[in-house]
């Protein structure tokens, strides 16, 4: 994961001081890309421990179309707590847009099922895309989508994916985002009888918060370790039938975790 550390250093070296919605302040760059060959290992940051339980359960929660944090709480995941209302609701965030994008005539589009069908029946299509950026519902969301738009691509029997992330918290959020979409590529590839290819991450406003600087320097002082391997123990009937127990990360030997405040 040297690419991730190189991005951190780039933001420190080249970033512009900016104000932000949270009032915290950031160092920010605009436009950056990283490519991870998923054949070479699972891209889980090793210079600090990442909470894999949260990453897996959040993705399963998205795929169910859920937008209430009850499921996350049942599985000891608290990463969305700060944005939920008193009933645990977040509004029409990722899961709603992925699974039930509303149309003007009252129907709903299941984008995940749509892209799966495209991958199986028209893998050369240039329209195998999922968007969470629904302009008509942004004002109803507790938090506008940060990882907003992703596209799948099939070549030589391998499935690749590119994500556009409009806003990226490099220290806290990005390790989760990389691992989450890498996991999704593995799951989609298994469902479509494909090998995994590359995960390409593209960032817009890519920033380090001003209260993450000490943590960033600590992480940069650590040497990356070998990437772990993802094992999926079974092939469920559909992309929506995976369970937490289906996944195993083999050989994950990270440095200790580093705590940092969340900008809300």
From Swiss-Prot:
GO terms for molecular function: thymidylate synthase activity. Pathway: Pyrimidine metabolism; dTTP biosynthesis. It comes from the Bacteria. Signal peptide: none annotated. Its EC number is 2.1.1.45. Keywords: Cytoplasm, Methyltransferase, Nucleotide biosynthesis, Transferase. Homodimer. Catalyzes the reductive methylation of 2'-deoxyuridine-5'-monophosphate (dUMP) to 2'-deoxythymidine-5'-monophosphate (dTMP) while utilizing 5,10-methylenetetrahydrofolate (mTHF) as the methyl donor and reductant in the reaction, yielding dihydrofolate (DHF) as a by-product. This enzymatic reaction provides an intracellular de novo source of dTMP, an essential precursor for DNA biosynthesis. This is Thymidylate synthase. It comes from Escherichia fergusonii (strain ATCC 35469 / DSM 13698 / CCUG 18766 / IAM 14443 / JCM 21226 / LMG 7866 / NBRC 102419 / NCTC 12128 / CDC 0568-73).
């Amino acid at each position: 994961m040297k690419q991730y550390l190189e991005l951190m250093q780039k933001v420190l070296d080249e970033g512009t001081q900016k104000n932000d919605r949270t009032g915290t302040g950031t160092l920010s760059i605009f436009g950056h890309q990283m490519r991870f060959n998923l054949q070479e290992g699972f891209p889980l940051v090793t210079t600090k421990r990442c909470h894999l339980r949260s990453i897996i359960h959040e993705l399963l929660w998205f795929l169910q179309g859920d937008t209430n944090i009850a499921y996350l709480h049942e599985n000891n995941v608290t990463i969305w707590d700060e944005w939920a209302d008193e009933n645990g609701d977040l509004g029409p965030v990722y899961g709603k847009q992925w699974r039930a994008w509303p149309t003007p005539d009252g129907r709903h589009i299941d984008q995940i099922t749509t892209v799966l069908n495209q991958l199986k029946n028209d893998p050369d299509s240039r329209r195998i895309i999922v968007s969470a950026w629904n302009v008509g519902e942004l004002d109803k969301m507790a938090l506008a989508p940060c990882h907003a738009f992703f596209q799948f691509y099939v070549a030589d029997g391998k499935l690749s994916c590119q994500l556009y992330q409009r806003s990226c918290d490099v220290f806290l959020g990005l390790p989760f985002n990389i691992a989450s979409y890498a996991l999704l590529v593995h799951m989609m590839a298994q469902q479509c009888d494909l090998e995994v290819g590359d995960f390409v991450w593209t960032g817009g406003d890519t920033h380090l918060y001003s209260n993450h600087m000490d943590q960033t320097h600590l992480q940069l002082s650590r040497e990356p370790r070998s990437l772990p391997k993802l094992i999926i123990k079974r092939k469920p009937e559909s992309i929506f039938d995976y369970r937490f127990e289906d996944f195993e990360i083999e050989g994950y030997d990270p440095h200790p975790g580093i705590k940092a405040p969340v900008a809300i």
